[in-house]
Amino acid sequence: MVKMIVGLGNPGSKYEKTKHNIGFMAIDNIVKNLDVTFTDDKNFKAQIGSTFINHEKVYFVKPTTFMNNSGIAVKALLTYYNIDITDLIVIYDDLDMEVSKLRLRSKGSAGGHNGIKSIIAHIGTQEFNRIKVGIGRPLKGMTVISHVMGQFNTEDNIAISLTLDRVVNAVKFYLQENDFEKTMQKFNG
């Protein structure tokens, strides 16, 4: 079996620490203690790293298509490596959840998230595993774009750091148990 863990975000240093890049941050945290080196693959339009965990090949992916076209990279990789949709997890930000809240789902709509809209459009289904990290709603008078492209304040940064640790633990648990339902039961909340 082959697994693929995708973190959504935008490429480039100017977006590196923005709320919208929580998926990239999660991938970086997951691979921190693994022997994974990323390569910038122009064919797949993604940064890709891989390793074996429990005798299974696991790909860690950060699409370089910019958020709104993430589905291009995800579809290309699923097809090329013949990865089953049930072996895909997508990690991304959710502004409809409080900062640092974590929610795991095995299906659902895009909920207004353009990266998820793109993935659904390209793979043709809403039924794929996802880990949503809350980034909160914009403050009064602030646009959604300026909110998601902004950085976390000091207080939220601490909370997000702890949440990213939970994301790492959830992904490790999933890779160990090979059961997303069980992972949802353990880590939702």
From Swiss-Prot:
This is Peptidyl-tRNA hydrolase. It comes from the Bacteria. One of its GO terms (cellular component) is cytoplasm. The keyword RNA-binding applies. Its EC number is 3.1.1.29. GO terms for molecular function: peptidyl-tRNA hydrolase activity; tRNA binding. Its main location: cytoplasm. InterPro entries: Pept_tRNA_hydro, Pept_tRNA_hydro_CS, Pept_tRNA_hydro_sf. It is found in: Cytoplasm. The lineage of its organism: Bacteria, Bacillati, Bacillota, Bacilli, Lactobacillales. One of its GO terms (biological process) is protein quality control for misfolded or incompletely synthesized proteins.
